[in-house]
Amino acid sequence: MKKKIKKIFAERSSWTFDKNIAQKFDYHINKSIPLYSEFQWIACQLSDYFLKEDSIVYDIGCSTGTFLKVLAYRHKNKKKIKFYGLDIVKSMIDFAKKKSNYKNIQYINKDISNFKFKKSDLIISFYTIQFIHPKKRQNILNKIYKHLNWGGGFFFVEKVRSYDARTQDMLTNIYEEFKINNGFSLKEIINKKHSLKGVLEPFSTNANILLLKRSGFKDISSIGKFINFEFFLAIK
């Protein structure tokens, strides 16, 4: 019998992050999203091409702050570099602050729509924009582009829709098999799917690229894609 993983319960209602989720989040997300760690590894490697001695970095939807800690360690010899983690969920920020031992990382409980950015060399968004209402996404991407320095990078990782319903059904089934193989029960998968209706709204690859282009990005590449998750690199 498969070992049951630690659970984040999702009832058949709108998805929310409760106050206890932060402690389980990293374990859960690694079990839920294919190539989660691998995409973070790619992001670390790519960061070398954007970060300088006095760079500013933003992680939008930083959750528990784990990735920013990895990034801060990688660039520990850049003494003036500053990292900012933003998340709308207070319990995530509180947890991130408790486990952080880097003086150059600041965690902020703030909605990106109301946040005032400084000019930065790198902005990161792992699986965050997909939770923002579609009518607000273009303004968010415009804001990101505006506050990047020339030559700055935007690491944009999202769940994506397929171009046609048949392929979407295939990939959804494959993704559900992935979660079952990682210890989730069918009931958990169904409840999670229902709870995310109207909350998680993925765009297609083309729609995400159009968002980036309309905001001003010209150099846009798909760095990696697995099932229905994709890593975009956009450079100003």
What are these regions (language model features)?
Residues K159-L211:
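C-terminal alpha-helical "lid/dimerization" subdomain adjacent to the S-adenosyl-L-methionine
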Residues S37-E53:
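Conserved alpha-helix/loop element of class I SAM-dependent methyltransferases that forms part
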Residues G151-K159:
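Conserved beta-strand signature within the Rossmann-like core of class I S-adenosyl-L-methionine
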Residues I124:
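A conserved beta-strand element that flanks and buttresses the S-adenosyl-L-methionine
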Residues S215-K236:
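Core SAM-dependent methyltransferase catalytic element
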Residues Q138-W150:
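A short glycine-rich, Lys/Arg-flanked "PGG" loop and its adjoining helix->strand segment in the class I
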Residues Y58, S63-S113:
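Class I SAM-dependent methyltransferase SAM/SAH-binding core
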Residues M1-K24:
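N-terminal, positively charged/glycine-rich alpha-helical extensions of SAM-dependent methyltransferases
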